[in-house]
Each structure stands twice: as C-alpha cells, then as structure tokens.
C-alpha cells in the first residue's frame, strides 16, 4: 500500500481492536484492521466486534473481507487451501451480536449471511492465483480460545460443516446490520482434531501453515480490489430499510443518537428531534 497512515477511531461501543491502517492499493482506498491487535494481543472472546465493524462503517468502508485461519472439517479441504464459505453456524456463547437494543429493536435477515457479489468477486480473484479454492460450505464459529475436543469435532462434522474457526461470528451479523458487504476468505491450516492420520491441531501447526497462506491471501486481495466498484447492486446497502420494528416515536433519544450512523438516513425526522 501507499500513502499509509494509522488512524484511531472512537466508537459508541468502545475501542476497536487497534488503530485502522488506511492507504491506497492500485489507486483504490483501502482500510485494514488487525483484528487481534498488532502483536496478536486479543483472544477471540476479547474482540470488540461492534467497535470493529462500527469503525469500518464510519470510515466509509463498503466491502469487508474477513481473512481467517480455520480448521478443515472435510477431507477434500486440505491445509493451505482457500475457502469462501457461504453459510455460518454461530456456536459462540459470550459475544454481543447486535448494535440494537436499549429501546430500538431491529431484525436483519441472515438467511444468506455472505454478500453474493463480494463472494463471487473474491472467488474470481482467488482462482487467478495458484492456490486451491473452494467456494461455498459452512463455517462454524466456536467460542475458543481452546480448540475443540475430539467429541465436539466429530459432532460438528456430523452436522455437515466445512470449516471451523473462532472469529467470523458475530462479525458477519454485525456487518449485515451495518449494511456492509461481507465475505470471509478462510485459510485452512489443519484438520482440527477429527482426522485419523493427521496430528491434532496445535498453535505450532496453525502458525506454520498460516504463514505459508499469508502470501496467497495478499495475492487474492490485490487481485480483488480492481473487481470492486460502485455502485453496489446487492441488497446489502438497504438491509435496514424495513428491519427496524420499533416505532420512531418510541425511540429513546440517547439510543437514537448512538445509532445515527446506521439508521439516520431512514429516520431523519427522529434525528432532528434529538
């Protein structure tokens, strides 16, 4: 990237994982957030997902690609393969998964949690690289930070999931609420703990294969950027148009003010009353 600068962003939901890195890539403005903080200081359960997504939204980001290390739950998805999942299963336990509440209720559809346009562009970019790419499948997100027991891994496999990780939920839910196009580029590093002839997942295995995958991920992202361009024609930019069920007359002023970035364009009269 060129014209790089690190920018601190304050949000109504606390501090994001780190400062946001802004710059230009092939002439396009891009923003990067080290999700676990520089130096990997934050465990999955410690991530402030709301602040992270809010920060991206406030900086004008429209497309979010979540790069994530995952374990493979299918024989055909080998370590160092790339996966672009189309479904998520949220098995987390301790994470706040919505911007809404405190007097304003919204229900955003999650039947198709991944933006199809972004996923298609991501697949096109990935297939231009030497990496093996799998499009589709389900990512199960567990709480962590521990890896699965063998019994848990076998149960997840019986559910038909394809990869397992610790970070894409509630990230995908919050991206939908923020009307951002969202997709995950999953980097397979291991076979979790279910495989009979491969070692059980360990930090050493994850780090070794992740380092090898990083070059592939960077290559994919470089090829992806030119494929994205306004206007967005998917449903993502208007997901909140009919999602807020609370009457505007009942909006608590403080909550309405806090959520202005998300709902201000739909409720301008409420905004002027604040």
Task: Please describe what each predicted stretch is.
Residues 1-111, 267-274:
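Metabolite-binding pocket within alpha/beta catalytic cores that recognizes anionic/polar moieties
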Residues 57-60, 157, 176:
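Non-catalytic positions within long, well-ordered alpha-helices that form the structural scaffold/packing
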Residues 62-63, 162, 181:
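Short acidic/polar active-site loop segments enriched in Thr and Asp
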Residues 117, 121-132, 219-227:
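Generic non-transmembrane alpha-helical segments
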Residues 125-162, 245:
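Active-site/ligand-binding-proximal alpha/beta "capping" segment
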Residues 166-204:
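Zn-dependent metallopeptidase/amidohydrolase metal-coordination segment
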Residues 193-241:
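His/Asp/Glu-rich mid-to-C-terminal helical/loop segments that flank catalytic regions of hydrolases
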Residues 233-273:
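A short, charged, Gly/Pro-tolerant segment at domain boundaries
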